Amino acid sequence: MTHIVCPHCQAVNRARDERSADKPNCGKCHQPLFDGPVALTAATFDAQVNRGDLPVLVDFWAPWCGPCQMMAPHYEQAAASLEPAVRVAKVDTESEPDLGARYNIRSIPTLALFRNGREVARQAGAMGAGDIVRWVRAQL
């Protein structure tokens, strides 16, 4: 069994490993558990990173950042390849400066990979979809 945190209501769902690829819905709010990158806030970050069993890939970005805007569609494509094995998320460092400070984000875009509540890898700079997927899989 894998524990998956709902990106909509933050409820923890149990899913059989062999069924997690079947586009599961939340048992509480009935929304899809995987639907592309999840926008995280200070209120939802810890639940996604600490309460589920999945590794969490976070893109720390800002709306004014040109490379961030260029990477956004590639990040969406990478999410389609990585889900449901990895929770793919984004943090807008303009809206959530405390999260950027908490993780000492010095340049954007920065990708951080979390596993079991701890950061296990970090990569700064814009990347293409294939590079993102390869980098994440190399870390796991």
Give the positions of each predicted feature.
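Non-catalytic, surface beta->alpha helical segment in thiol-disulfide oxidoreductase systems
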Residues: 17, 107, 112-140
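Typically the conserved alpha-helix immediately C-terminal to a functionally engaged Cys/Sec
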Residues: 67-82
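Short Cys/His-rich micro-motifs in 6-15 aa windows
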Residues: 29-38
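Short pre-active-site segment immediately N-terminal to redox-active cysteine/selenocysteine motifs
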Residues: 53, 60-64, 107
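Short cysteine-rich clusters marking metal-coordination/redox-active sites
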Residues: 6-9, 26-29
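Short linker/helix segments within small regulatory modules
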Residues: 15-24
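A short beta-strand-turn-helix
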Residues: 38-56
